[in-house]
């Protein structure tokens, strides 16, 4: 029977993700429109975003946080181009974005001493094969496959190389051992539902040391430059951005952090995400026609949850269109490079009740189109 209730928020996209519950444009009323980001007020606003992010995450005291251009992609690229090349590189690939990093390292930077460990969608490469004498490049959560690393146990405390981690769809949703990561990047529009175009860059003291002791052989564009005169440009990590940010997007980020504080901070955010995943675990357990793409529970993402559905590609498209037409779910098709299926965002800004409601609609639509 066709469900009678609909989700309060039908936005289940994996980026940009749903705004937090109760979101209102009123929350942006203190945006310093028309003011320079270099003014005292502008710098204060950006520094506030940096400090509140650091405090919410509980980062080590000696780690630096900065706002950089071009979303998570910009943040991660600037580190690949600025830090790699002085030792071997191990790259872990198991979905589209991690494959993109491997392509940049081998085809754009053209580094020679590179080992690529690749697994198909739904699986992880063998983490035991990683050599931490090399720099290690990986994503914490594979946004396009719904597969994450199980934990940080495979990363040694003492390592010669740097660990560079794209954590954009994991941070604020998963327990991450920051001290095992030298570079951490993410964007505002994922777990907390901020706006696009801005990246956040977190550096360990070891990453800073690399920047100050190694100069790549290739030219670096202005928006990738993290040093001045051989020293780290610390102003980037105090609110003086490389180029002009959107003060409106920054205000929106401050609003998301305020909401995150209101629900209790990091641990409740992680719990909300896990509770959301549990809705689908129950749904998959009682329906034999839908399956997680991730092969095992320990590597199953709790944010970008990916499914295989026992339907032809045409019927699957029909299911997705039906749910969009009914205004119950937007943007839930799998990523263009991934196996056909569903990808449903379960991060902290999504309400559990909306997912429970969505499950009823997916079941109805499946029976309608099959």
From Swiss-Prot:
Compartment(s): Cytoplasm
Cofactor(s) the protein requires to work: pyridoxal 5'-phosphate
The keyword Electron transport is assigned to this record: no
Modified residues (N6-(pyridoxal phosphate)lysine): 190
Gene Ontology terms: biological process: L-serine biosynthetic process; pyridoxine biosynthetic process
Pathway per the UniProt entry: Amino-acid biosynthesis; L-serine biosynthesis; L-serine from 3-phospho-D-glycerate: step 2/3; Cofactor biosynthesis; pyridoxine 5'-phosphate biosynthesis; pyridoxine 5'-phosphate from D-erythrose 4-phosphate: step 3/5
Positions bound to L-glutamate: 38
Comment on bound cofactor: Binds 1 pyridoxal phosphate per subunit.
GO molecular function, one term: O-phospho-L-serine:2-oxoglutarate aminotransferase activity
UniProt EC number: 2.6.1.52
Main location class: cytoplasm
InterPro entries documented for this protein: Pser_aminoTfrase, Pser_aminoTfrase_methanosarc, PyrdxlP-dep_Trfase, PyrdxlP-dep_Trfase_major, PyrdxlP-dep_Trfase_small
Binding-site residues for pyridoxal 5'-phosphate, renumbered to this chain: 101, 143, 166, 189, 243-244
Subunit structure: Homodimer.
UniProt family annotation: Belongs to the class-V pyridoxal-phosphate-dependent aminotransferase family. SerC subfamily.
Xref: NCBIfam families: PRK03080.1-2, serC_2
Protein name: Phosphoserine aminotransferase
Biological source species: Methanosarcina barkeri (strain Fusaro / DSM 804)
Gene name for this UniProt entry: serC
């Amino acid at each position: 029977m066709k469900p009678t209730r609909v989700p309060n928020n039908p936005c289940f996209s994996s980026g940009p993700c749903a705004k937090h519950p109760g979101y209102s444009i009123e929350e942006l009323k203190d945006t310093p429109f028309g003011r320079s980001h270099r003014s005292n007020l502008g710098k204060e606003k950006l520094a506030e975003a940096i400090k509140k992010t650091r405090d919410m995450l509980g980062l080590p005291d000696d780690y630096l946080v900065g706002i950089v251009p071009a979303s998570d992609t910009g943040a991660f690229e600037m580190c690949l181009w600025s830090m790699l090349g002085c030792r071997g590189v191990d790259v872990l690939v198991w979905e589209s974005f991690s494959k993109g990093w491997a392509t940049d390292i081998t085809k754009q930077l053209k580094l020679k001493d590179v080992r690529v460990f690749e697994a198909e969608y739904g699986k992880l490469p063998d983490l035991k094969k990683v050599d931490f004498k090399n720099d290690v490049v990986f994503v914490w959560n594979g946004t396009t496959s719904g597969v994450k690393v199980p934990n940080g146990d495979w990363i040694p405390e003492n390592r010669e190389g740097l660990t560079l981690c794209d954590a954009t769809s994991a941070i604020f949703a998963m327990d991450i051992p920051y001290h095992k990561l030298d570079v951490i990047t993410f964007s505002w529009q994922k777990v907390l539902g901020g706006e696009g175009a801005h990246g956040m860059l977190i550096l360990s003291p070891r990453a800073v040391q690399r920047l100050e002791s190694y100069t790549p052989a290739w030219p670096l564009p202005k928006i990738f430059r993290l040093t001045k005169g051989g020293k780290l440009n610390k102003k980037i990590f105090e609110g003086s951005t490389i180029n002009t940010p959107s003060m409106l997007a920054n205000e929106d980020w401050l609003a998301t952090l305020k909401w995150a504080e209101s629900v209790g901070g990091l641990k409740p955010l992680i719990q909300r995400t896990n509770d959301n995943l549990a809705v689908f675990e129950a749904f998959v357990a009682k329906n034999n026609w839908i399956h997680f793409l991730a092969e095992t529970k320990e590597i199953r993402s709790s944010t970008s949850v990916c499914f295989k559905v026992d339907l032809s590609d045409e019927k699957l498209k029909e299911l997705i269109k039906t749910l969009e037409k009914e205004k119950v779910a937007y943007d839930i098709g799998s990523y263009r490079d991934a196996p056909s299926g569903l990808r449903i965002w379960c991060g902290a800004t999504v309400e559990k009740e909306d997912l429970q409601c969505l499950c009823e609609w997916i079941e109805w639509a499946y029976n309608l189109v099959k």
